[in-house]
């Protein structure tokens, strides 16, 4: 049983469904794309939920898109995290060949071992220009890649949903890219045969199906096929009721964000209500009229309310007035530790180190030193933060652009962000210095830096290797001297050391 028979048996194909393998005639046996033998059986979306809607599927969630947007703006910790990630991603929004540190994006061949031809280089530069301008030509009225990427990164960190429209040319290729408010994009209503049979989404061709709609004020204002709108989520799930939407970090942090707002409000009330209001005023043994009580309340508020009244001592002329303090400790809620805990939880969910948003982590939620990933210092913590949070976000954006844009032009090329692991000039010099003393020659290092070779530069500056070469040269010189002495003794000619011939002639 050969490989293809085993593959057919594993796939459960009937004998009449088996096909002979087809190969290309390029000299290498390359298996061509095969057609599926049966339709998908699984259901990935709830058909009833889609058809009971107003032509689109609403995301079932406790928080609306508008609430998620307000949370990302009004909570300072979440806002700082999102803004930090947006700024970090924006540093990769220009071609890497334009920057000195090599940070940016590049278009290269998908096969890393292939050497590009001149035609492929020209096509890569054309694709690079298209991505940079978000279109074939420069248009100041259209978003460039920096603006586009800032918009979609903010959307994906807020809603776990990004989208941009792909305006096609006459050949069906991308001509322009326009960012779309992700909060207005919904999945279109699924098609059902005869009102009974469920149709798997993969069984419907994208060019024939309206896959996405834009909803504004509850009304559908635009419709898009799968090739006209890019849609991506970072946290996909198999839940039938959720498909095809993702899971936003803010949905996970509802309780923590609310607690943080309450804690800030609790502390800010000190300035709005004064510092001596956490107690009870008791007028003992007096029948105070409503008018007198209101007058006393106005006097008390005038003296203590606002930032100017904080921690002031009230002076009143009321007999039998007693103040009962109900705040026995200024650490009754462990305010600082509680705030530190909430900030750390928010940063953990967003996969970012608190120090990146200017909140130093003192080792844990309690603010005491302790073991953890940050023991190696700030550089180790930042590197760990980049590996956990920034790198996956960059890879996600790469996959979206490759899927919806680059692959529409050619399968030969791929879009990549580069420079995340780039070193500084000092680090590069230190690395080159170590390499030239271990396994690289001087001329090899000079070639990497676009410098011409130097005479006698094909040597590794390792002391052991250098001593070995020197000893070898000395042995060869000594052997040559012995051979010359033997030849001169046989011929009777006196061997004169180099440099002494002129002195003998002068005499």
Swiss-Prot record:
Gene Ontology cellular component terms for the protein in this record: viral capsid
Residue runs in coiled coils: none
Cellular localisation: Virion
Gene behind the chain: 3.1
Family named by the database record: Belongs to the phage portal family.
Protein name (record): Probable portal protein
Subunit structure: Homododecamer.
Function field: Forms the portal vertex of the capsid. This portal plays critical roles in head assembly, genome packaging, neck/tail attachment, and genome ejection. The portal protein multimerizes as a single ring-shaped homododecamer arranged around a central channel. Binds to the terminase subunits to form the packaging machine.
One of the record's GO molecular function terms: DNA binding
Ranges where the record places region Disordered: 1-44, 476-507
